[in-house]
């Protein structure tokens, strides 16, 4: 491609509404332009990257045995009503009416459509397993679209759905897709982690997320220093190093703590570390018909954070997790939040495993402005229920017994689920088994945010000059930059010759034949993030050399004209 005939729409200034670095650089590099909130036009440069991501995904999906289909973006409401999600999905589902006043939605996902298709097309267990995928624009009406492509309302996604006669078959395909995803993200050239995950609103049993590691990531993931264990913060199991609490060494005493309503202020007031305190959080339980919801107490170590996903899954706890109001707390306990503790608390109480091994701790006294010190389980307060209630922290033991956990930020770009019969049962998607009996199919669901991968790659790879692409995703692999080619026949002829050789070798090359100053060309190539740059000049050619510089390199290197093409091919493994 010749730069003189290509839309290079770079910007010198960063638009004011671009918050994260990927959004800033995609705008400045001329990859995208905003049309409306959460809606973007992909310019030629950005589309090249998007297509490279898409091509790798498609190649590996085909290799895995999945079959490509293309389903309508607009879906009839009847299917969503049948699955039960028409009302459940919430405001992100864009609902529309056609001219006949029939209800439709713009698809954020396609479980209903694919289930309807397969229940009409597949009739026998002999046709299973079957796996279908598409790469298609989706729409979710985000309340607050932000971060550019990272959280847009319209986005390109690869979604795949598999169908099975039994759980064993689903388990096999799940691992096939897990392995395919691992190959995909490896081919992208990104630093990523597959992690155990919660299935969330889509439902199902087993679930893994694929995260690109980046300091700007919104998600925290935990992984072991000595094994392959990895999980997102919602899912990671928190272990304690102690099996039981040490023996009491202090007497329980009540102390006045006027105005101290937080763990931080109580710790400072009593001059002790937060890990020697416990906090008691009150949430609503499941209500019986005609009765108010009961209140349940959750007790954690003062320095730990409640994991709301874990808490929500506790038997008897209302879903979604709802904290009790101050009025309900005062009515049930007799004091306001900030002075509540587990001693003589007239509520069902669940103690986190790490809090359950504390001794001589501090907690609220269930009296306004009062706390208890020297509290010990058993002697002062009975434990009836324990559970894993907290987020893991760095240094926790790895749940597989190998090493300790470290926490890093990640950007979720892929997700695989075992859906089971969540949709197939609701929509009566059955096949005849080997005995001629109708059996509900088991399903798997596998998604990759194709456009989100582009933003995640930038969040992981950039510097103060611009984007640093991995070779596999770069819009062009090589920038060929001739200096003064419009006045120098020697430079122009050698540039054209090298350009032709690189194209012949299958290299994705951009010839910067614009009549621009060298500094402008260099700055734009670095902003765009082309991994390899070759500069051709009169001075270099006089010595039979050109100048090479990798995007990650600090200094440039001179090499002979005759060797540069093979050097590039070797770099790119062509």
From Swiss-Prot:
GO terms for biological process: prolyl-tRNA aminoacylation. It is found in: Cytoplasm. GO terms for cellular component: cytosol. Disulfide bonds: none annotated. Its EC number is 6.1.1.15. It is an enzyme of class 6 (ligase). Signal peptide: none annotated. Keywords: Aminoacyl-tRNA synthetase, ATP-binding, Cytoplasm, Ligase, Nucleotide-binding, Protein biosynthesis. It catalyses: tRNA(Pro) + L-proline + ATP = L-prolyl-tRNA(Pro) + AMP + diphosphate. Its main location: cytoplasm. GO terms for molecular function: aminoacyl-tRNA deacylase activity; ATP binding; proline-tRNA ligase activity. Consists of three domains: the N-terminal catalytic domain, the editing domain and the C-terminal anticodon-binding domain. Belongs to the class-II aminoacyl-tRNA synthetase family. ProS type 1 subfamily. PANTHER family: MITOCHONDRIAL RIBOSOME PROTEIN L39/PROLYL-TRNA LIGASE FAMILY MEMBER (PTHR42753), PROLINE--TRNA LIGASE (PTHR42753:SF2). Homodimer. Catalyzes the attachment of proline to tRNA(Pro) in a two-step reaction: proline is first activated by ATP to form Pro-AMP and then transferred to the acceptor end of tRNA(Pro). As ProRS can inadvertently accommodate and process non-cognate amino acids such as alanine and cysteine, to avoid such errors it has two additional distinct editing activities against alanine. One activity is designated as 'pretransfer' editing and involves the tRNA(Pro)-independent hydrolysis of activated Ala-AMP. This is Proline--tRNA ligase.
């Amino acid at each position: 491609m010749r730069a003189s005939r290509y839309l290079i729409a770079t910007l010198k200034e960063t638009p004011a509404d671009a918050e994260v670095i990927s959004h800033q650089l995609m705008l400045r590099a001329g990859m995208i332009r905003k049309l409306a909130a959460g809606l973007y036009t992909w310019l030629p440069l950005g589309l090249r990257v998007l297509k490279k991501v898409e091509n790798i995904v498609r190649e590996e999906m085909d290799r895995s045995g999945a079959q490509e289909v293309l389903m309508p973006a607009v879906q009839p409401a009847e299917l969503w009503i049948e699955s039960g999600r028409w009302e459940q999905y919430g405001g992100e589902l864009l609902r529309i009416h056609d001219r006949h006043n029939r209800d439709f939605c713009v698809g954020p996902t396609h479980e209903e459509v694919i289930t309807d298709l397969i229940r009409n097309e597949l009739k026998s267990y002999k046709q299973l397993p079957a796996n279908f995928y598409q790469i298609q624009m989706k729409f979710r009406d985000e309340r607050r679209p932000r971060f550019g492509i990272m959280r847009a309302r319209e986005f390109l996604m690869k979604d795949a759905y598999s169908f099975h006669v039994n759980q064993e078959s689903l388990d096999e395909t799940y691992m096939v897709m897990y392995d395919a995803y691992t190959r995909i993200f490896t081919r992208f050239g990104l630093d990523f982690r597959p992690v155990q995950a919660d299935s969330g609103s889509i439902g199902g049993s087993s679930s893994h997320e694929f995260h690109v590691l980046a300091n700007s990531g919104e998600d925290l993931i935990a992984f072991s220093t000595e094994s392959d264990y990895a999980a997102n913060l919602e899912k990671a199991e928190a272990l304690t190093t102690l099996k039981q609490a040490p023996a009491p060494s202090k007497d329980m005493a009540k102390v006045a703590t006027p105005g101290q309503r937080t763990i931080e202020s109580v710790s400072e007031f009593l001059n002790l570390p937060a890990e020697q305190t416990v906090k008691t959080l009150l949430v609503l339980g499941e209500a019986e018909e005609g009765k108010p919801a009961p209140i349940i107490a959750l007790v954690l170590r003062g320095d730990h954070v409640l994991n709301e996903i874990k808490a929500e899954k506790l038997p008897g706890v209302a879903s979604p997790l709802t904290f009790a109001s101050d009025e309900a707390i005062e009515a049930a306990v007799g004091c306001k939040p900030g002075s509540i503790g587990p001693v003589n608390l007239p509520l069902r109480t669940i103690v986190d495993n790490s809090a359950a091994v504390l001794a001589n701790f501090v907690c609220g006294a269930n009296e306004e402005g009062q706390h208890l010190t020297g509290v010990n389980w058993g002697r002062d307060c009975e434990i009836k229920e324990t559970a894993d209630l907290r987020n893991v922290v760095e240094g926790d033991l790895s749940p597989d017994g190998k090493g300790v956990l470290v926490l890093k930020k990640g950007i979720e770009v892929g997700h695989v689920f075992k859906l089971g019969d969540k949709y197939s049962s609701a929509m009566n998607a059955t096949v005849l088994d080997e005995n001629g009996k109708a059996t509900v199919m088991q399903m798997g669901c596998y998604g990759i945010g194709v456009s989100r991968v582009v933003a995640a790659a930038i969040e992981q790879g950039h510097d103060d000059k611009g984007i640093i692409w991995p070779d596999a995703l770069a819009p062009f692999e090589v920038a060929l930059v001739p200096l003064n080619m419009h006045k120098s026949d020697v430079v122009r002829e050698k540039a054209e010759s090298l350009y032709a050789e690189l194209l012949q070798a299958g290299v994705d090359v951009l010839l910067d034949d614009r009549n621009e100053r060298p500094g402008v060309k260099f700055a734009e190539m670095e902003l765009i993030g082309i991994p390899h740059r070759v500069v051709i000049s009169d001075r270099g050619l006089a010595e039979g050399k050109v100048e090479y510089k990798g995007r990650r390199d600090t200094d440039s290197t001179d090499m002979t004209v005759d060797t540069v093409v093979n050097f590039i091919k070797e770099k790119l493994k062509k």
